[in-house]
């Protein structure tokens, strides 16, 4: 249930439906912390296809979101009018790369995060009163991230001394742990240039239709860069996985 202690101050929880943000909500409920709503921003690959790994998106909409609403926590879903695909295909309008397609976002300078996630969140934040309290999912064993909290941001995981592993166990016990933790320790879009090898291998093995979309983008001419991440083209990763499969088949 939503706490009635809030009076005139709004309390919201930033929620990716990962272990830390869901554990934050569970702690708020357990300890009677004021909480008015959870806010989730969904990045889209195109107008119909989510940027969430399919298993995580199914978990969000089929398990976690309905569960939170049954517990009395309304969930506000934000989306940008821009998608990964139309940003990728967009044309650079100035500078030495003028006329080229933007192509794959750069690690550390992700235009997708900026335009598809941060801007909708900031637009929503501008509608809030200055005294709004935002709960963020940063664990007690993340000191660097905790030091960067703004004045209106609160970590309930720090307050109640929950580490990342504690948060994971809390979600597991509550039946609210995303299945993506079976193959990754981080959240992120399935097209993220920071994706680890294990995450990419999961996409290759289990979602060939999405993998094929990325190969189509790799083949698109006139991009700023051919690199998917700092060192490789997406087609290089595809070739490496095909080689691994061939070696496994030969060994068998």
Question: Where do the PLM segments sit?
Answer:
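Nucleotide-activated chemistry modules centered on ATP-dependent adenylation/adenylyltransferase
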Residues: 1-252
């Amino acid at each position: 249930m939503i706490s009635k202690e809030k009076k005139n101050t709004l309390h919201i929880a930033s929620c990716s439906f990962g272990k830390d943000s869901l554990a934050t909500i569970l702690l708020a409920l357990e300890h009677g912390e004021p909480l008015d709503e959870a806010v989730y921003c969904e990045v889209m690959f195109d107008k119909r296809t989510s940027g969430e790994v399919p298993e995580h998106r199914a978990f969000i909409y089929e398990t976690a979101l309905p569960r939170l609403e049954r517990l009395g926590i309304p969930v506000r879903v934000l989306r940008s009018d821009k998608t990964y695909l139309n940003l990728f295909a967009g044309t650079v309008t100035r500078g030495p790369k003028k006329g080229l397609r933007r192509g794959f976002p750069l690690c550390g300078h992700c235009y997708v995060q900026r335009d598809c996630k941060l801007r909708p969140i900031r637009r929503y934040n501008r509608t809030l009163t200055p005294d709004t309290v935002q709960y963020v999912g940063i664990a007690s064993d993340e000191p660097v991230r905790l030091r960067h909290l703004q004045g209106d941001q609160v970590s309930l995981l720090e307050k109640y001394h929950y580490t990342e592993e504690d948060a994971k166990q809390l979600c597991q016990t509550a039946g609210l742990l995303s299945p993506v933790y079976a193959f990754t320790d981080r959240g992120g879009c399935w097209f993220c240039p920071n994706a680890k090898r294990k995450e990419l291998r999961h996409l290759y093995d289990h979602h060939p239709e999405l993998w094929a979309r990325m190969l189509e983008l790799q083949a698109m001419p006139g991009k700023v860069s051919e690199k998917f991440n700092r060192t490789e083209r997406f087609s290089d990763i595809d070739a490496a996985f095909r080689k691994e499969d061939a070696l496994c088949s030969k060994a068998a």
